[in-house]
């Protein structure tokens, strides 16, 4: 197995849905199914924060979501937890700057997909040199979902990464909605990652479909 090609990775990032049980006000499996029907291209399991599942409940829930993703041939990525990703044979893992370092993650994960959150050019270059397949750049807009976020960068921060010669696939993160998706893509992102724009939408299907349309229109 070889590492994922850049073109394929770029396409997978178009509509990147991130979710845990505590991000939904209704059945998370129903939300994910609607989102998959609507056109989610990659999914990240992020079970963190107040009211999140732990232990066996967390593992069982992850497996249920993974099974659903597999039915749609949509990659299932685990946030932070490399051991869980290995246990589940997930398609990949996403790590932040405060999580396990990219070098040891790449050693453990082999050729699986690895995404890294990057806030500076230095972080981005280090991640790429040590095996990141894509970067999560942000927060682009203010967000209420993640409490521990860095300073908001705006689309200028994203454009700056491209201006500095960062060519790997990038997904925009933080406060992204249907209304501001076009600006994120036009600034240089290959796709948008969202939590509440889908998880709290009246119709996860409609919200995902509109996000997908905006991305494709703006690329």
From Swiss-Prot:
| Membrane-crossing segments per the record | none
Q: Which UniProt keywords apply?
A: Magnesium, Metal-binding, Thiamine biosynthesis, Transferase
Establish whether keyword Acetylation is in the entry. no
Question: Which pathway does the record list?
Answer: Cofactor biosynthesis; thiamine diphosphate biosynthesis; thiamine phosphate from 4-amino-2-methyl-5-diphosphomethylpyrimidine and 4-methyl-5-(2-phosphoethyl)-thiazole: step 1/1
CDD domains xref list: TMP_TenI (cd00564)
What is the documented function of this protein? Condenses 4-methyl-5-(beta-hydroxyethyl)thiazole monophosphate (THZ-P) and 2-methyl-4-amino-5-hydroxymethyl pyrimidine pyrophosphate (HMP-PP) to form thiamine monophosphate (TMP).
> What PANTHER family does this protein's entry cite?
THIAMINE-PHOSPHATE PYROPHOSPHORYLASE (PTHR20857), THIAMINE-PHOSPHATE SYNTHASE (PTHR20857:SF15)
Q: Which HAMAP family does UniProt cross-reference here?
A: TMP_synthase
What is the protein's name according to its record?
Answer: Thiamine-phosphate synthase
Q: What organism does this protein naturally occur in?
A: Bacillus cereus (strain ATCC 14579 / DSM 31 / CCUG 7414 / JCM 2152 / NBRC 15305 / NCIMB 9373 / NCTC 2599 / NRRL B-3711)
